[in-house]
């Protein structure tokens, strides 16, 4: 990169940098790692980087968000869709603390992400300067759940080293977020051109994630455990799955006729239409599938951490050693035996593990074929809805989505009972078909779905559908302005029941008829969407939904469809009143 003015910057009345500065070198390093989009909210602390984005606008796009939490969620979504670390830029102090919700989400969801934080100048550090925060303490490993690594770059010449290490750390082992702190004066410092044997700092080459392979002895032992089994069950999910890995998993399942359940909010890992699909193992699990997990004699956990949500609050598998034989395959050795003691623990990335499994030869006769068929029949039976009150029939709404959305549509959600309708009734075609279709936070983060959907539209250009609730939407609804600014079309269905529904449900379960802190007085969401530049539609009956959806698919701009949902319709299986009555009877 030339240190002199580039033709792109040679505009009348526009000053261009004469020297190559740290902010420009940083952007060059991002480009070298294949970054095409960075998300963030601008700040004075990293003006030199913003100038670098201007200088390299033909190679990388900086997406301006309206709040740093939304920016971090968009970077997270971009990473899940591309398999490469998402990139987010925020300023010091409140910018970084706002972004922390997205960093925690990326950590719990094992999403590779690099957060760049503009910081106070070096000569004012440790004086509690304006907006100063000790980011190593705030994000660091001592927080046990925020970032994999936190580093400050004090020497402009070492920017390439730190950026490359951040990307490697974010991708390898258990993927996750890395934070790089950028002192303002370091970014503005001139990058020396080098003399003699000392070369000028340059971006380091593109890095791929390192593949960890299963050792042959472990794979042979896995086959032995399969041959000893009568009721095996695969639970697949977690981070690091590619199209090729999902295809290899499907071939492995087909060769051995194994039933496959997808881990919590990784429902696109295995094709939901496949005759071996058993359902999703997570919140609101099919009771019959929960019993299948308990009754199985061999669990093959391929990819998931086996956290609280996938294990039904650590009840589906006994702690610390399950009754079932347990094979746990994970990309990070630190996750193996951390919660559950596995009979066989295999440290391998999903690409490598699935390729090792697909070549395992199965015997001609398998004793569990009827078991596998019954697992799938249980799943199909769970698609049949219960009769619930009100003018909106949510299973029919989901069936219409299934009918009209293209197979590669991306579905996003935040946190709330509203998501359970999609989780139970929508059937993903699976990553093996060539595309990722689900963006959902396993950390249960409210406000994720709207910005994630916008990032999906920007990243893929595919149809994007977001389901949200009245409480969830107002956490990050301001990002509709970002969507309109960048022409990102999403279709949003907002279920408005006038309360924080999940909390109210649990409130009635534990403290029946003693509501507090859960009722909401809401704005006119359709009018609010129109104010941002979306089409805004309100419906009150099931019959109104299909024409509203078809019109949304035809529009060039995004659409928000507000649905007034009866507060009684609190879950896919029952009513709020029934939960209250059950709690009162229990207390009597």
What are these regions (language model features)?
Residues 4, 25-35, 77-83, 169-174, ...:
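Glycine-rich phosphate/diphosphate-binding loops that line cofactor/substrate pockets in enzymes
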Residues 5-7, 11, 117-161, 184, ...:
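Glycine-rich, acidic loop regions that bind phosphate or pyrophosphate groups
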Residues 30, 36-40, 60-63, 81-120, ...:
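A short, small-residue-rich loop immediately preceding and capping a beta-strand
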Residues 116, 124-133, 276, 283, ...:
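Thiamine diphosphate
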